[in-house]
Curated annotation (Swiss-Prot):
Name the UniProt record assigns to this protein: Histone-lysine N-methyltransferase set-18
Binding residues annotated for Zn(2+) 2, in chain numbering: C65, C68, H86, C90
Phenotypic consequence of D247A: Decreased dimethylation of 'Lys-36' of histone H3
Source domain of life: Eukaryota
Gene: set-18
Species: Caenorhabditis elegans
PANTHER family xrefs: HISTONE-LYSINE N-METHYLTRANSFERASE SET-18 (PTHR12197:SF300), HISTONE-LYSINE N-METHYLTRANSFERASE SMYD (PTHR12197)
GO molecular function ontology, one term from the record: zinc ion binding
Amino acid sequence: MAVKKNKNVPKQEDPLVQKDEISSIHARIKIFETPFATQVLNPKVSEFCANCLRGPAPGEKLLRCGGCNFSMYCSKECQATAWLVHKPECKRLKASFPNLPLTEVLFLSKVIDRIQFLEKNGDKLGIEAERKFSSLVDHKVDIRDDEEKMAHFEKIFEKMGAFRGEEMIEKGEFFDVFCKATINSHSIHTNAGNEVGMALDLGVSKYNHSCRPTCSMVFDGYRVCLRPLVPGVDAENTEEAFISYIDVGRSKYIRRRDLNSRWYFNCECTRCMDPEDDALTAIRCANPACDAPILTSETEEPMNIACEKCKTIVEEDTVKAAQEYMKTLPASFDPKCPAEIEALPGKLKELLAKAEQILHPSNVYVARLRTALFHVTGTLTMDNLSSMHTQIYNNYKMCFPKADRHVGFQLLHIVKALIEKDERDEAMPYAFDAMNIFEVCFGLDHPYYLQTLALWTYLEKKIPKSTEELVQLTNFSDNRPIDIVSLLKRANMLPPPPYAAGTPGVA
């Protein structure tokens, strides 16, 4: 039986974001603020404006459209601006009451309305300034060969016909819309990572995926700010600016599976082609006294592997069992019913206990199980909580760019654990790194940056603050968006709103 030599050569530690890099990064942002179509998720309609996709101002409530009694707006100005898009939709919603169409149906219907508007009136608003809708990649052949996707198309086609009635387009034409929108649309999130809507932006759709992205998408409602995560990258340049289509904090096997299931390509980015990415799926050495990771992956041919550090042989059966166990673990934990929610903590503990026996502590599955358990229960059984957070942080550094907000959030978990142990000097550099990351990700005027700046200042200046006061600064409750509008105004890039008249009242 062949024996694989396990090479475990650690990469040289990348420095975190330096202050002299930040101004360089800010100078090369790219802003998109004319989407082709947007839609708030149905469960979020009462929380976010149907026009700007922002939440209401503090102390304010959304105003409901008096025509359809469904769409809601943060102001009369937003409702008036949206009328050009909402007018044809409004009467359909009223006619379909009390049957509410799926979010996807409402979204694709808006895409159809936009296409028809452009055909009739031309592109007066610059919606197709970045590229034409007709130029979008559609993967029609792949979608036709995908039985599950085609079954979904038939379902959506039927529901769209019921919603649009006599205004429904021919099936082949709708298939073209369905394919282009499926491949090129993106989700809209708050800064806390909560999904609130979906959008098709022709400019954003130009950017390719990388599991080692060089830019992040930051949202201000439907507006997108593309911010470089590394110095030297210009967000305008699609040859060097890459975004992530998926959650990149996972193994190569899971990333490629998800990318292929929706976008129909096998990712060969620099990270997916890097053998060291297998550190994310490392297993334990057979020698209990050895802490070296044994590199493998879920899909690698099982074989005996020799530990590079202690030379112990990890048997093929052990390797295969670990690979199979990783494949059985859920990619995410999203319980749907009260019984599942109640059972989740126990299930997570059981899965984690087995994972820790066979998988290395640096394994991404272990990190995700620990993170899920921490979020569900607020506690972990490990004696040294800061050590656990440091392990997850080291794992995140293998998954995310050094200026990614996920890394910043994990740094704050370390800061919190150290503060609670009264190790404030040790917490201070982690707070500083988190502050620099949030400056890159969110900007100088965002609450996340300002809050972390205050935390670092208190620690660095040794200002007398209670543990409770410092810990409070590690918890983010403000979900305010990045103020991209102010950036546009400063750059004189904000266009006037389209002409709107004859809007119905708001309640």
